[in-house]
Protein backbone atom coordinates (compact mmCIF):
# COMPACT_ATOMS: atom_id res chain seq x y z
CA UNK A 1 0.00 0.00 0.00
CA UNK A 2 1.11 3.50 -0.69
CA UNK A 3 1.76 6.09 2.02
CA UNK A 4 -1.44 7.73 3.16
CA UNK A 5 -2.60 11.19 2.15
CA UNK A 6 0.81 12.87 1.94
CA UNK A 7 -0.55 15.70 -0.23
CA UNK A 8 -3.14 16.55 2.40
CA UNK A 9 -0.39 17.54 4.80
CA UNK A 10 0.35 20.51 2.52
CA UNK A 11 -3.17 21.89 2.82
CA UNK A 12 -3.80 24.21 5.72
CA UNK A 13 -7.25 25.59 6.40
CA UNK A 14 -9.90 26.46 3.85
CA UNK A 15 -8.78 29.95 2.89
CA UNK A 16 -10.91 31.81 5.47
CA UNK A 17 -11.54 31.93 9.21
CA UNK A 18 -14.50 32.32 11.52
CA UNK A 19 -13.91 36.05 11.94
CA UNK A 20 -14.34 36.74 8.24
CA UNK A 21 -17.35 34.67 7.19
CA UNK A 22 -19.12 36.23 4.19
CA UNK A 23 -22.87 36.60 3.74
CA UNK A 24 -25.17 37.21 0.75
CA UNK A 25 -28.41 39.14 1.34
CA UNK A 26 -30.15 37.25 -1.48
CA UNK A 27 -29.61 33.97 0.35
CA UNK A 28 -30.78 35.60 3.59
CA UNK A 29 -34.06 36.55 1.88
CA UNK A 30 -34.51 33.03 0.52
CA UNK A 31 -33.85 31.51 3.94
CA UNK A 32 -36.32 33.87 5.62
CA UNK A 33 -38.94 32.43 3.28
CA UNK A 34 -37.74 28.97 4.30
CA UNK A 35 -38.16 29.78 8.02
CA UNK A 36 -41.67 31.15 7.40
CA UNK A 37 -42.49 27.82 5.77
CA UNK A 38 -41.29 26.01 8.90
CA UNK A 39 -43.23 28.33 11.23
CA UNK A 40 -46.40 27.51 9.31
CA UNK A 41 -46.03 23.94 10.62
CA UNK A 42 -46.31 25.12 14.24
CA UNK A 43 -49.63 24.62 16.08
CA UNK A 44 -51.20 27.80 17.45
CA UNK A 45 -50.08 27.19 21.03
CA UNK A 46 -46.41 27.12 19.94
CA UNK A 47 -46.38 30.09 17.60
CA UNK A 48 -45.70 32.60 20.37
CA UNK A 49 -42.05 31.58 20.67
CA UNK A 50 -41.57 31.33 16.92
CA UNK A 51 -38.87 28.74 17.49
CA UNK A 52 -38.30 26.39 14.58
CA UNK A 53 -35.38 24.20 13.52
CA UNK A 54 -33.55 25.33 10.43
CA UNK A 55 -30.48 25.02 8.27
CA UNK A 56 -26.89 26.04 7.70
CA UNK A 57 -25.75 27.12 4.24
CA UNK A 58 -22.32 27.45 2.61
CA UNK A 59 -21.71 28.67 -0.95
CA UNK A 60 -18.48 28.87 -2.92
CA UNK A 61 -18.09 30.61 -6.29
CA UNK A 62 -14.79 29.84 -7.96
CA UNK A 63 -12.13 29.75 -5.27
CA UNK A 64 -13.98 32.23 -3.06
CA UNK A 65 -16.43 31.30 -0.31
CA UNK A 66 -19.25 33.83 -0.64
CA UNK A 67 -21.69 32.72 2.06
CA UNK A 68 -21.53 30.77 5.34
CA UNK A 69 -24.44 31.21 7.75
CA UNK A 70 -26.95 29.44 9.99
CA UNK A 71 -30.72 29.93 10.22
CA UNK A 72 -33.29 28.80 12.79
CA UNK A 73 -32.72 26.91 16.04
CA UNK A 74 -30.25 24.16 16.81
CA UNK A 75 -32.18 23.30 19.98
CA UNK A 76 -35.84 24.26 20.39
CA UNK A 77 -35.79 23.50 24.09
CA UNK A 78 -32.97 25.93 24.91
CA UNK A 79 -33.49 28.37 22.04
CA UNK A 80 -29.88 27.98 20.89
CA UNK A 81 -29.52 29.25 17.33
CA UNK A 82 -27.85 27.51 14.41
CA UNK A 83 -24.48 29.13 13.74
CA UNK A 84 -21.52 28.26 11.49
CA UNK A 85 -20.17 26.28 14.48
CA UNK A 86 -23.30 24.15 14.95
CA UNK A 87 -22.62 20.42 14.49
CA UNK A 88 -24.91 18.29 12.29
CA UNK A 89 -25.06 14.56 11.58
CA UNK A 90 -24.08 14.32 7.89
CA UNK A 91 -25.88 11.05 7.19
CA UNK A 92 -24.78 9.56 3.87
CA UNK A 93 -22.74 12.66 2.99
CA UNK A 94 -20.25 10.85 5.25
CA UNK A 95 -19.59 8.31 2.49
CA UNK A 96 -17.36 10.71 0.54
CA UNK A 97 -14.95 10.87 3.48
CA UNK A 98 -14.82 7.08 3.85
CA UNK A 99 -14.17 6.72 0.13
CA UNK A 100 -11.51 9.44 0.26
CA UNK A 101 -9.77 7.59 3.08
CA UNK A 102 -9.67 4.38 1.04
CA UNK A 103 -8.38 6.21 -2.05
CA UNK A 104 -5.65 7.78 0.08
CA UNK A 105 -4.48 4.36 1.24
CA UNK A 106 -4.71 2.11 -1.82
CA UNK A 107 -3.19 2.40 -5.28
CA UNK A 108 -5.28 1.80 -8.40
CA UNK A 109 -3.99 -1.78 -8.57
CA UNK A 110 -4.74 -2.39 -4.89
CA UNK A 111 -8.35 -1.30 -5.37
CA UNK A 112 -8.71 -4.53 -7.38
CA UNK A 113 -7.95 -6.63 -4.29
CA UNK A 114 -10.77 -8.98 -3.26
CA UNK A 115 -12.29 -8.16 0.12
CA UNK A 116 -11.54 -11.73 1.21
CA UNK A 117 -7.99 -10.42 1.75
CA UNK A 118 -9.38 -8.52 4.77
CA UNK A 119 -12.33 -10.72 5.79
CA UNK A 120 -11.07 -14.27 6.06
CA UNK A 121 -14.27 -15.65 7.51
CA UNK A 122 -16.59 -14.40 4.78
CA UNK A 123 -18.29 -16.79 2.33
CA UNK A 124 -16.61 -17.61 -0.99
CA UNK A 125 -18.36 -14.75 -2.80
CA UNK A 126 -15.93 -12.38 -1.04
CA UNK A 127 -13.26 -13.56 -3.52
CA UNK A 128 -15.25 -11.90 -6.32
CA UNK A 129 -15.94 -8.56 -4.61
CA UNK A 130 -13.20 -5.95 -5.04
CA UNK A 131 -12.48 -2.97 -2.83
CA UNK A 132 -13.54 -0.64 -5.63
CA UNK A 133 -16.91 -2.43 -5.77
CA UNK A 134 -17.58 -1.35 -2.19
CA UNK A 135 -16.71 2.24 -3.08
CA UNK A 136 -18.88 2.34 -6.21
CA UNK A 137 -21.90 0.35 -4.93
CA UNK A 138 -21.36 -2.53 -7.36
CA UNK A 139 -20.62 -5.26 -4.79
CA UNK A 140 -24.14 -6.81 -4.89
CA UNK A 141 -24.02 -7.05 -1.09
CA UNK A 142 -27.49 -6.64 0.44
CA UNK A 143 -28.00 -3.52 2.52
CA UNK A 144 -27.46 -4.26 6.20
CA UNK A 145 -30.46 -2.08 7.03
CA UNK A 146 -32.60 -4.69 5.26
CA UNK A 147 -30.71 -7.55 6.91
CA UNK A 148 -31.27 -5.91 10.28
CA UNK A 149 -35.03 -5.77 9.72
CA UNK A 150 -35.05 -9.38 8.54
CA UNK A 151 -33.11 -10.43 11.63
CA UNK A 152 -35.59 -8.72 13.93
CA UNK A 153 -38.41 -10.57 12.21
CA UNK A 154 -36.68 -13.94 12.57
CA UNK A 155 -36.43 -16.19 15.60
CA UNK A 156 -35.27 -14.19 18.63
CA UNK A 157 -32.65 -16.76 19.51
CA UNK A 158 -30.93 -16.40 16.13
CA UNK A 159 -31.08 -12.63 16.43
CA UNK A 160 -29.46 -12.66 19.87
CA UNK A 161 -26.58 -14.76 18.56
CA UNK A 162 -25.80 -12.06 15.99
CA UNK A 163 -26.52 -8.98 18.01
CA UNK A 164 -25.42 -8.35 21.58
CA UNK A 165 -26.01 -5.12 23.40
CA UNK A 166 -22.91 -2.84 23.34
CA UNK A 167 -21.99 -0.22 25.92
CA UNK A 168 -21.99 2.80 23.59
CA UNK A 169 -24.63 5.48 23.66
CA UNK A 170 -25.59 8.18 21.21
CA UNK A 171 -24.84 11.86 22.01
CA UNK A 172 -27.65 13.87 23.62
CA UNK A 173 -30.13 11.02 23.24
CA UNK A 174 -31.62 8.83 25.98
CA UNK A 175 -31.00 5.11 25.70
CA UNK A 176 -34.13 3.00 25.60
CA UNK A 177 -34.35 -0.02 27.85
CA UNK A 178 -33.77 -3.40 26.23
CA UNK A 179 -32.59 -1.75 23.02
CA UNK A 180 -30.54 -3.94 20.68
CA UNK A 181 -28.08 -1.63 18.98
CA UNK A 182 -26.24 -2.54 15.80
CA UNK A 183 -22.51 -1.80 15.49
CA UNK A 184 -20.05 -2.39 12.66
CA UNK A 185 -19.01 -5.69 14.23
CA UNK A 186 -22.60 -6.87 14.06
CA UNK A 187 -22.85 -5.81 10.41
CA UNK A 188 -19.84 -8.02 9.65
CA UNK A 189 -21.59 -10.93 11.36
CA UNK A 190 -24.79 -10.32 9.41
CA UNK A 191 -22.88 -10.26 6.12
CA UNK A 192 -20.92 -13.41 7.00
CA UNK A 193 -24.21 -15.24 7.51
CA UNK A 194 -25.32 -14.54 3.92
CA UNK A 195 -24.22 -17.64 2.04
CA UNK A 196 -25.12 -16.30 -1.41
CA UNK A 197 -25.33 -12.95 -3.17
CA UNK A 198 -28.58 -11.99 -4.92
CA UNK A 199 -26.56 -11.29 -8.10
CA UNK A 200 -22.98 -11.24 -9.33
CA UNK A 201 -20.72 -8.30 -8.39
CA UNK A 202 -19.93 -5.60 -10.99
CA UNK A 203 -23.11 -6.25 -12.96
CA UNK A 204 -25.18 -3.33 -11.69
CA UNK A 205 -25.00 -0.29 -9.49
CA UNK A 206 -27.11 -0.86 -6.38
CA UNK A 207 -26.83 1.55 -3.47
CA UNK A 208 -25.78 -0.38 -0.38
CA UNK A 209 -24.75 0.97 3.02
CA UNK A 210 -23.10 -2.38 3.75
CA UNK A 211 -20.22 -1.68 1.40
CA UNK A 212 -19.23 1.49 3.24
CA UNK A 213 -19.34 -0.17 6.65
CA UNK A 214 -17.00 -2.83 5.27
CA UNK A 215 -14.85 -0.10 3.73
CA UNK A 216 -14.43 1.55 7.15
CA UNK A 217 -13.30 -1.80 8.54
CA UNK A 218 -10.85 -2.27 5.65
CA UNK A 219 -9.33 1.14 6.43
CA UNK A 220 -8.89 0.02 10.04
CA UNK A 221 -7.29 -3.30 9.13
CA UNK A 222 -5.02 -1.80 6.46
CA UNK A 223 -3.74 1.13 8.54
CA UNK A 224 -4.09 -0.26 12.09
CA UNK A 225 -6.13 2.89 12.80
CA UNK A 226 -9.84 3.37 13.25
CA UNK A 227 -11.51 5.42 10.54
CA UNK A 228 -12.05 8.18 13.09
CA UNK A 229 -8.33 8.50 13.84
CA UNK A 230 -7.23 8.15 10.23
CA UNK A 231 -9.57 10.89 9.02
CA UNK A 232 -8.69 13.19 11.90
CA UNK A 233 -4.95 12.90 11.25
CA UNK A 234 -5.03 12.91 7.45
CA UNK A 235 -8.07 14.99 6.49
CA UNK A 236 -9.83 16.88 9.27
CA UNK A 237 -6.82 18.33 11.11
CA UNK A 238 -4.78 19.27 8.01
CA UNK A 239 -7.80 21.08 6.55
CA UNK A 240 -8.67 22.82 9.81
CA UNK A 241 -11.94 20.89 10.15
CA UNK A 242 -11.60 20.95 13.91
CA UNK A 243 -15.28 20.35 14.74
CA UNK A 244 -15.67 17.29 12.49
CA UNK A 245 -15.52 13.77 13.91
CA UNK A 246 -16.61 10.18 13.38
CA UNK A 247 -18.97 8.79 16.00
CA UNK A 248 -17.82 5.20 16.45
CA UNK A 249 -17.65 2.50 19.12
CA UNK A 250 -14.88 4.38 20.96
CA UNK A 251 -17.09 7.45 21.40
CA UNK A 252 -18.37 7.63 24.97
CA UNK A 253 -19.45 11.23 24.90
CA UNK A 254 -21.31 13.10 27.59
CA UNK A 255 -23.42 16.18 27.11
CA UNK A 256 -20.59 18.51 28.19
CA UNK A 257 -17.93 16.93 25.97
CA UNK A 258 -16.21 19.47 23.67
CA UNK A 259 -17.44 17.63 20.56
CA UNK A 260 -21.06 18.09 21.63
CA UNK A 261 -21.12 21.64 22.98
CA UNK A 262 -22.57 22.94 19.72
CA UNK A 263 -24.37 19.81 18.48
CA UNK A 264 -27.85 20.42 17.08
CA UNK A 265 -30.86 18.24 17.76
CA UNK A 266 -33.08 17.07 14.92
CA UNK A 267 -36.87 17.28 14.72
CA UNK A 268 -39.73 15.64 12.89
CA UNK A 269 -42.67 17.80 11.86
CA UNK A 270 -45.78 16.19 13.40
CA UNK A 271 -49.22 17.52 12.56
CA UNK A 272 -50.82 19.18 15.58
CA UNK A 273 -47.62 18.95 17.65
CA UNK A 274 -45.14 21.03 15.70
CA UNK A 275 -41.56 19.80 15.85
CA UNK A 276 -40.85 16.69 17.92
CA UNK A 277 -37.22 15.82 18.79
CA UNK A 278 -35.85 12.64 17.25
CA UNK A 279 -32.64 11.01 18.25
CA UNK A 280 -32.66 7.39 19.21
CA UNK A 281 -32.34 4.49 16.81
CA UNK A 282 -30.72 1.09 17.36
CA UNK A 283 -28.86 1.84 14.11
CA UNK A 284 -27.19 4.99 15.47
CA UNK A 285 -23.90 3.19 16.10
CA UNK A 286 -22.71 2.06 12.66
CA UNK A 287 -20.29 4.26 10.70
CA UNK A 288 -18.50 4.44 7.38
CA UNK A 289 -21.81 4.70 5.59
CA UNK A 290 -22.75 7.60 7.88
CA UNK A 291 -22.19 8.94 11.40
CA UNK A 292 -19.68 11.65 10.55
CA UNK A 293 -20.64 14.89 12.27
CA UNK A 294 -19.56 18.31 11.02
CA UNK A 295 -20.29 22.03 10.85
CA UNK A 296 -21.12 24.15 7.83
CA UNK A 297 -17.83 26.02 8.06
CA UNK A 298 -15.89 22.74 8.14
CA UNK A 299 -17.82 21.48 5.11
CA UNK A 300 -16.99 24.72 3.31
CA UNK A 301 -13.31 23.99 3.97
CA UNK A 302 -13.73 20.47 2.58
CA UNK A 303 -15.41 21.75 -0.58
CA UNK A 304 -12.74 24.44 -0.94
CA UNK A 305 -10.01 21.78 -0.78
CA UNK A 306 -11.70 19.60 -3.40
CA UNK A 307 -11.71 22.59 -5.74
CA UNK A 308 -7.92 22.37 -5.94
CA UNK A 309 -8.30 18.77 -7.13
CA UNK A 310 -10.94 19.86 -9.66
CA UNK A 311 -8.72 22.51 -11.19
CA UNK A 312 -5.73 20.19 -11.49
CA UNK A 313 -7.86 17.46 -13.09
CA UNK A 314 -9.82 19.60 -15.53
CA UNK A 315 -7.04 21.85 -16.75
CA UNK A 316 -4.83 18.82 -17.43
CA UNK A 317 -7.54 16.65 -19.00
CA UNK A 318 -7.36 18.19 -22.48
CA UNK A 319 -3.71 19.24 -22.49
CA UNK A 320 -2.04 18.24 -25.80
CA UNK A 321 0.47 15.43 -25.63
CA UNK A 322 -0.13 14.85 -21.96
CA UNK A 323 -1.23 11.44 -20.76
CA UNK A 324 -4.01 11.45 -18.24
CA UNK A 325 -2.56 10.82 -14.80
CA UNK A 326 -3.97 7.64 -13.34
CA UNK A 327 -4.12 7.45 -9.56
CA UNK A 328 -6.58 6.22 -6.99
CA UNK A 329 -7.69 9.75 -6.12
CA UNK A 330 -8.92 10.30 -9.70
CA UNK A 331 -11.55 7.60 -9.10
CA UNK A 332 -13.42 10.17 -7.00
CA UNK A 333 -14.91 11.35 -10.27
CA UNK A 334 -14.93 8.06 -12.21
CA UNK A 335 -18.43 6.65 -12.79
CA UNK A 336 -19.48 3.10 -11.99
CA UNK A 337 -22.28 1.23 -13.74
CA UNK A 338 -25.83 2.60 -13.87
CA UNK A 339 -28.83 0.78 -12.46
CA UNK A 340 -31.07 2.29 -15.16
CA UNK A 341 -30.88 5.08 -17.74
CA UNK A 342 -32.66 7.68 -15.61
CA UNK A 343 -30.10 7.43 -12.85
CA UNK A 344 -27.07 9.64 -12.55
CA UNK A 345 -23.69 7.91 -12.44
CA UNK A 346 -21.84 7.23 -9.18
CA UNK A 347 -18.16 7.67 -8.36
CA UNK A 348 -16.62 7.40 -4.91
CA UNK A 349 -19.17 8.75 -2.46
CA UNK A 350 -20.61 11.11 -5.08
CA UNK A 351 -23.33 10.98 -7.71
CA UNK A 352 -21.95 12.30 -11.00
CA UNK A 353 -23.41 14.39 -13.83
CA UNK A 354 -21.60 15.06 -17.12
CA UNK A 355 -22.78 17.24 -19.99
CA UNK A 356 -21.62 18.90 -23.20
CA UNK A 357 -23.39 21.97 -24.57
CA UNK A 358 -22.97 24.94 -26.89
CA UNK A 359 -23.10 28.60 -25.93
CA UNK A 360 -22.53 31.97 -27.56
CA UNK A 361 -19.48 33.79 -26.26
CA UNK A 362 -17.81 37.06 -27.10
CA UNK A 363 -14.63 36.63 -29.16
CA UNK A 364 -11.59 38.91 -29.00
CA UNK A 365 -12.81 40.80 -32.07
CA UNK A 366 -16.07 41.59 -30.29
CA UNK A 367 -18.25 39.21 -32.30
CA UNK A 368 -20.44 36.52 -30.78
CA UNK A 369 -19.34 33.00 -31.68
CA UNK A 370 -20.67 29.57 -30.77
CA UNK A 371 -18.36 27.46 -28.64
CA UNK A 372 -18.61 24.00 -27.11
CA UNK A 373 -18.49 23.70 -23.33
CA UNK A 374 -18.32 20.84 -20.88
CA UNK A 375 -19.91 20.73 -17.45
CA UNK A 376 -19.36 18.37 -14.56
CA UNK A 377 -21.12 18.07 -11.24
CA UNK A 378 -20.94 15.89 -8.15
CA UNK A 379 -23.56 15.74 -5.44
CA UNK A 380 -24.91 13.63 -2.60
CA UNK A 381 -27.76 13.71 -0.15
CA UNK A 382 -27.48 12.61 3.46
CA UNK A 383 -30.55 11.60 5.44
CA UNK A 384 -30.69 10.02 8.85
CA UNK A 385 -33.52 10.31 11.39
CA UNK A 386 -34.53 13.96 10.92
CA UNK A 387 -31.20 15.15 9.52
CA UNK A 388 -31.50 16.09 5.83
CA UNK A 389 -28.40 17.36 4.03
CA UNK A 390 -27.12 18.07 0.55
CA UNK A 391 -23.76 18.89 -1.01
CA UNK A 392 -23.32 19.78 -4.69
CA UNK A 393 -20.29 20.89 -6.67
CA UNK A 394 -20.25 21.99 -10.32
CA UNK A 395 -17.71 23.07 -12.91
CA UNK A 396 -17.96 24.31 -16.49
CA UNK A 397 -15.23 25.12 -19.03
CA UNK A 398 -14.85 25.77 -22.74
CA UNK A 399 -13.40 22.97 -24.83
CA UNK A 400 -10.14 24.14 -26.40
CA UNK A 401 -9.26 23.92 -30.06
CA UNK A 402 -7.59 20.68 -31.12
CA UNK A 403 -4.05 20.52 -29.80
CA UNK A 404 -4.60 23.35 -27.32
CA UNK A 405 -4.85 23.17 -23.50
CA UNK A 406 -7.90 24.27 -21.54
CA UNK A 407 -7.93 28.03 -21.01
CA UNK A 408 -8.09 28.63 -17.22
CA UNK A 409 -10.05 31.82 -17.91
CA UNK A 410 -12.99 29.75 -19.20
CA UNK A 411 -13.14 27.50 -16.14
CA UNK A 412 -15.82 28.31 -13.56
CA UNK A 413 -16.92 26.38 -10.49
CA UNK A 414 -19.41 26.47 -7.67
CA UNK A 415 -20.04 24.56 -4.45
CA UNK A 416 -23.13 24.46 -2.23
CA UNK A 417 -23.67 22.74 1.13
CA UNK A 418 -27.07 22.59 2.85
CA UNK A 419 -27.36 21.05 6.34
CA UNK A 420 -30.77 20.85 8.03
CA UNK A 421 -32.09 19.45 11.31
CA UNK A 422 -35.75 18.85 10.40
CA UNK A 423 -38.05 16.91 8.09
CA UNK A 424 -40.56 19.69 7.43
CA UNK A 425 -38.87 20.11 4.05
CA UNK A 426 -40.13 16.82 2.64
CA UNK A 427 -43.78 17.73 1.90
CA UNK A 428 -42.66 20.95 0.21
CA UNK A 429 -40.27 20.20 -2.65
CA UNK A 430 -39.39 23.88 -2.96
CA UNK A 431 -37.45 23.65 0.30
CA UNK A 432 -36.11 20.13 0.09
CA UNK A 433 -32.33 20.48 0.65
CA UNK A 434 -31.40 19.65 -2.95
CA UNK A 435 -34.12 21.94 -4.34
CA UNK A 436 -33.00 24.66 -1.95
CA UNK A 437 -29.46 24.21 -3.22
CA UNK A 438 -30.65 24.61 -6.81
CA UNK A 439 -32.45 27.85 -5.93
CA UNK A 440 -29.26 29.19 -4.38
CA UNK A 441 -27.19 28.15 -7.41
CA UNK A 442 -29.56 30.03 -9.72
CA UNK A 443 -28.72 33.23 -7.85
CA UNK A 444 -25.18 32.94 -9.25
CA UNK A 445 -25.47 30.98 -12.50
CA UNK A 446 -29.07 31.70 -13.48
CA UNK A 447 -31.00 28.92 -15.20
CA UNK A 448 -27.77 27.40 -16.49
CA UNK A 449 -27.28 25.37 -13.31
CA UNK A 450 -30.74 23.79 -13.57
CA UNK A 451 -30.79 23.41 -17.37
CA UNK A 452 -27.30 22.04 -17.96
CA UNK A 453 -26.09 20.53 -14.69
CA UNK A 454 -28.94 19.57 -12.37
CA UNK A 455 -31.38 17.45 -14.37
CA UNK A 456 -34.29 17.33 -11.92
CA UNK A 457 -33.87 13.61 -11.21
CA UNK A 458 -31.14 13.86 -8.59
CA UNK A 459 -33.40 14.94 -5.73
CA UNK A 460 -35.19 11.62 -5.91
CA UNK A 461 -32.18 9.40 -6.41
CA UNK A 462 -29.37 10.68 -4.22
Describe each region flagged by the PLM.
Residues 48-56, 77-134, 197-211, 287-290, ...:
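Short active-site loop at a secondary-structure junction
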Residues 71, 126-383:
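Short, surface-exposed loop or secondary-structure junction motifs
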Residues 61, 65, 115, 122, ...:
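Short, solvent-exposed turn/loop segments enriched in Gly/Ser/Thr/Pro and often Arg
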Residues 4-73, 225, 232, 274-462:
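Catalytic loop of the DD-peptidase/beta-lactamase superfamily, centered on the K-T-G motif
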Amino acid sequence: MKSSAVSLKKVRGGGFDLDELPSDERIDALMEKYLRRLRSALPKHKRATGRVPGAAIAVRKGSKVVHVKGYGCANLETGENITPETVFDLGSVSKQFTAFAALSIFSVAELEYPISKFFRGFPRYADKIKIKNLIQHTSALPDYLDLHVAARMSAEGWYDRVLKRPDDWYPLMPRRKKAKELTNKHVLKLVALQSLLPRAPEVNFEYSNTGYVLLAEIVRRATKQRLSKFLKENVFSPLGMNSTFVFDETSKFRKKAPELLHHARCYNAVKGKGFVPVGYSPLNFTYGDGNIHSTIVDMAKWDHYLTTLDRETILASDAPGRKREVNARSILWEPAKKLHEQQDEYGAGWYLLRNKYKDNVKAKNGRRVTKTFRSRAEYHRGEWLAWENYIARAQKWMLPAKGKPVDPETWESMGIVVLTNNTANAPNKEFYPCALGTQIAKLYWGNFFEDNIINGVNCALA
